[in-house]
Amino acid sequence: MVRRPLASALIALACVAVPLLGCRKHKNTGPASTGSNQSGSSSSPTAFARNETLYVGGRQWGEPSNFNPLAGWQDWPVNSMNLIYETLVMYNPVEGKLVPLLAESWDVKGDSVSFTINKAAKWNDGKPVTGEDVKYTFDLGKQFASLLMSPLWTGKYITDVKLTDPQTVTFTLDATKKNALPVLDAAVEIRIVPKHVIEPMMTAAGNNIDEFLKNKMDKELVGSGPYKLLTYSSEKIVTQRDDNYWGNAVFFGGKLAAPKFVTHPIFKSNDHFSVGLQQGNVDTSASFLPRIQEKKNVKAWYDKPPYFVSATIPMLWPNVLQAPLDDVHLRRAMAFSINYTDIRELAVSGYSDPLESGMILPFDKLENKYFSAEDAKQFGASRYDVEAAKAELKTGGYTSVFKDGELVEMKDKSGKKVPTITIKSPTGWTDWESIVKIVVKSMRAAGIDAREKFVDASLFWGDLYTADFDVIMFTPTAPPSPSTPWRRFDVVLSGAEWAPKGEKRYKNLGRFNNPKGPGYIARIDELLNEIPRIKDEAELVKAYRELNLIFMKNQPTLPLVYRADQFYEFTEQAWKGFPTAANPFLPPQMPGDRLGTRILWHLTPAGGK
């Protein structure tokens, strides 16, 4: 399955023949020079020694076309990786703590958040990383609303980014919200760009962001991370270790990352990744592999079900701008009709705990204190109950017409035929396709006229953010972050950035709870504003319980299953030293991905291929 990680409140890809494939190169003829990061004539495939090359998967489908760090759609390793561009800090979801990266320290106050940049941090061209680079990066979001850092400004979370001194950057919080959580999330997710490189390019583009984004930036990428782009083709992308990486001395006592090359082969399907992992041609991946316990030589975080750490909730998002999806009775009927056990056991191979109603993870040690089993039992609809689904349909005045046991149509209370509800999902995302098929089968059996609609991923993303759908499948806030679970509720429920169909938004994708519309529930936005400022734990539990209760009663989205942040899987045929639940020195994130980047310094060649 292909999955692209997105910055959601500021707002993941996959797939093996033998991975030692030739690539185009424009300048250098082989990987011998650490300083080269050019793309694309042919280099000898044998040049990449197996004991020097780590093969990763799950973050790239299709021929690479864009390495621009400001683009909304980027190729590996720019897309959510810390290999070339780095974030201010990283987040450890196992411990719920921030970890230094470009910023060596941070300070959260009632009206501001400050980050002090490590004086040792350098770009790979030798220039220092300074507060000016950080300020410039986030100021771009103020200037251009299409960039991923813009919601800090458009959401009115900050009013200013200023330099306290050359190495210290202070984000001034909006005086009415005083919400530091989105700033901390941004510090984890937004990769800092070099002002001395990007600003002249922006000027050359006439300060037009659309013109700037036409530059795919596949040559001489100036980043602060431990690797450089070496070469790419339609078959693979290769990065090469920067032996002068500033973090070697700061974090690892001068030690270099173990792999000289980190390579992402480009394949057609999850099946290819499965074969690659089993044969040892791919070392680690984040792709969905069904029945991982049956895959020879392939390991995961846990050695028994659910194998992966559940951290997200894939959902169906009804477009409440259109009838009948604006009817809460229909939405609750849809929720009751779904066979969640089939989804968990068949579609996702048991990689999930049983689903509970609401948007709080009841098994997560950091947020289970906010979950109320009593409320879920009394008010929740995320359980398979066909009779309850039919009762909700009846209350809403709907009539289902069957012939020979098959649903023919559904009529509303006026007797008018209800248009077939299409559920949109990307083609090729195999686990999502399976989920949607189970959902459609369940809904039709309960009398709800729904059909699947699988579309190309390039169309999916545009439709998702402009509300061009009846119902769409999407996972909000995929990466765990400092603001969890507040951010999950904010992305689903917030009316602060509500927009009509056709306008791009990264939150409230179903356009629920229009602040200027009838039936606006003001308490939702009140709670979303209050929770980040609550210090008393008992009051925080109370506030989350109320917010979760509102969600369950109104069912603006339909949670389907719990899912891993990423399907962290690996084989130790060529490299050893991956973290697991039995040895959790780092979280279950593939090398190069966020804090998982530090796995690269713990790996050792296995002495195999």
Language model regions located:
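Ligand/substrate-recognition segments at binding pockets and active sites
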Residues: 26-29, 233-234, 260, 269, ...
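Detector for C-terminal structural segments
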Residues: 33-41, 79, 233-237, 241, ...
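Surface-exposed binding/hinge segments that line
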Residues: 49, 107, 151-206, 226, ...
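N-terminal lobe/hinge region of extracytoplasmic solute-binding protein
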Residues: 55-110, 139, 222
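Gly/Pro-rich hinge or "lid" segments in bacterial periplasmic/extracellular proteins
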Residues: 92-93, 97, 188-256, 260-261, ...
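Extracellular/periplasmic solute-recognition and catalytic clefts
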Residues: 141-146, 151, 161-162, 230-240, ...
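Ligand-site clamp/hinge motif
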Residues: 215, 244-295, 440, 449-456
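Structural transition elements
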Residues: 227, 354-403, 427-434, 535
